[in-house]
Amino acid sequence: MLILTRRVGETLMIGDEVTVTVLGVKGNQVRIGVNAPKEVSVHREEIYQRIQSEKSGSPSEGGNF
């Protein structure tokens, strides 16, 4: 795992087309902005896991959504 330190307003690049910008820090929460092409899916981890479990036909952990 690559670990980077960024300040508010600073950006990192993933490949040539994806940028991740630190928008703000408040307590233990960090707000980030992600710019990516439409063909690149961007999800929070828990949403991605729910999508994957729905694709495989497994019931989701949290009940109905």
UniProtKB/Swiss-Prot annotation:
<dbReference type="InterPro" id="IPR003751">
    <property type="entry name" value="CsrA"/>
</dbReference>
<dbReference type="InterPro" id="IPR036107">
    <property type="entry name" value="CsrA_sf"/>
</dbReference>
<dbReference type="GO" id="GO:0048027">
    <property type="term" value="F:mRNA 5'-UTR binding"/>
</dbReference>
<protein>
    <recommendedName>
        <fullName>Translational regulator CsrA</fullName>
    </recommendedName>
</protein>
<comment type="subunit">
    <text>Homodimer; the beta-strands of each monomer intercalate to form a hydrophobic core, while the alpha-helices form wings that extend away from the core.</text>
</comment>
<comment type="function">
    <text>A key translational regulator that binds mRNA to regulate translation initiation and/or mRNA stability. Mediates global changes in gene expression, shifting from rapid growth to stress survival by linking envelope stress, the stringent response and the catabolite repression systems. Usually binds in the 5'-UTR; binding at or near the Shine-Dalgarno sequence prevents ribosome-binding, repressing translation, binding elsewhere in the 5'-UTR can activate translation and/or stabilize the mRNA. Its function is antagonized by small RNA(s).</text>
</comment>
<dbReference type="GO" id="GO:0005829">
    <property type="term" value="C:cytosol"/>
</dbReference>
<dbReference type="GO" id="GO:0006402">
    <property type="term" value="P:mRNA catabolic process"/>
</dbReference>
<dbReference type="GO" id="GO:0006109">
    <property type="term" value="P:regulation of carbohydrate metabolic process"/>
</dbReference>
<keyword id="KW-0963">Cytoplasm</keyword>
<comment type="similarity">
    <text>Belongs to the CsrA/RsmA family.</text>
</comment>
<keyword id="KW-0678">Repressor</keyword>
<keyword id="KW-0810">Translation regulation</keyword>
<dbReference type="Pfam" id="PF02599">
    <property type="entry name" value="CsrA"/>
</dbReference>
<dbReference type="GO" id="GO:0045948">
    <property type="term" value="P:positive regulation of translational initiation"/>
</dbReference>
<keyword id="KW-0694">RNA-binding</keyword>
<dbReference type="GO" id="GO:0045947">
    <property type="term" value="P:negative regulation of translational initiation"/>
</dbReference>
<keyword id="KW-0010">Activator</keyword>
